[in-house]
């Protein structure tokens, strides 16, 4: 397991996601102030935001002002969430893992109760014999 590569890949994915969030913010703003430009940006962006850096690079060729605006918003979002993100990721994964384990245990328990094995039926019969 190459932790350094995992960290780099995670950072790139997060960067692309923040680019997407910045795009959504800019689209909302433009929807109020310049609907034709919002429509152009939406049309331009369809299917292109998976790689945030390639998207910004291509947008620079078409509309440099919009590329700069998205980069500015993306940087602002990153600054706002960076402080909380590591702990939120850790605790989110811990809680999700605990919930998955709980659900798995409930399913296993439910299966055991609804389909008892012959040994457990024999054990139940033996247990009731002790009562007499």
Curated annotation (Swiss-Prot):
It comes from Nostoc sp. (strain PCC 7120 / SAG 25.82 / UTEX 2576). Signal peptide: none annotated. It holds the Pfam family RbcX. The gene is rbcX. Homodimer. Interacts with the exposed C-terminal peptide of RbcL via its central cleft, contacts a second RbcL monomer via its peripheral polar surface. RbcX and Raf1 can bind simultaneously to RbcL. An RbcL-specific chaperone. The central cleft of the RbcX homodimer (RbcX2) binds the C-terminus of an RbcL monomer, stabilizing the C-terminus and probably preventing its reassociation with chaperonin GroEL-ES. At the same time the peripheral region of RbcX2 binds a second RbcL monomer, bridging the RbcL homodimers in the correct orientation. The RbcX2(2)-bound RbcL dimers then assemble into the RbcL8 core (RbcL8-(RbcX2)8). RbcS binding triggers the release of RbcX2. Residues 110-132 are annotated as: Disordered. Keywords: Bacterial microcompartment, Carbon dioxide fixation, Carboxysome, Chaperone, Cytoplasm, Photosynthesis. The homodimer has 2 functional domains, a central cleft essential for production of soluble RbcL in which the RbcL peptide binds, and a polar surface which plays a role in correct RbcL subunit arrangement. Its main location: other. InterPro entries: Chaperonin_RbcX_sf, Chaperonin_RcbX, RbcX. Residues 111-132 have a biased composition (Polar residues). One of its GO terms (molecular function) is protein folding chaperone. GO terms for biological process: carbon fixation; photosynthesis; ribulose bisphosphate carboxylase complex assembly. This is RuBisCO chaperone RbcX. One of its GO terms (cellular component) is carboxysome. Belongs to the RbcX family. It is found in: Carboxysome; Cytoplasm. Coiled coil: none annotated. PANTHER family: CHAPERONIN-LIKE RBCX PROTEIN 1, CHLOROPLASTIC, RUBISCO CHAPERONE RBCX.
């Amino acid at each position: 397991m190459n932790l350094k590569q995992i960290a780099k890949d995670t950072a790139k994915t997060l960067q692309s996601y923040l680019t997407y969030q910045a795009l959504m913010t800019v689209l909302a703003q433009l929807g109020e102030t310049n609907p034709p430009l919002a429509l152009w940006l939406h049309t331009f962006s369809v299917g292109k935001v998976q790689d945030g850096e390639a998207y910004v690079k291509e947008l620079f060729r078409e509309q440099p002002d919009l590329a700069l605006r998205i980069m500015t918003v993306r940087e602002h979002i990153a600054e706002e969430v960076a402080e909380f993100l590591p702990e939120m990721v850790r605790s989110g994964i811990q809680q999700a893992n605990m919930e998955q384990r709980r659900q798995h245990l409930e399913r296993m328990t439910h299966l055991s109760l609804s389909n008892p094995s012959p040994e457990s039926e024999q054990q139940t019969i033996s247990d009731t014999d002790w009562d007499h």
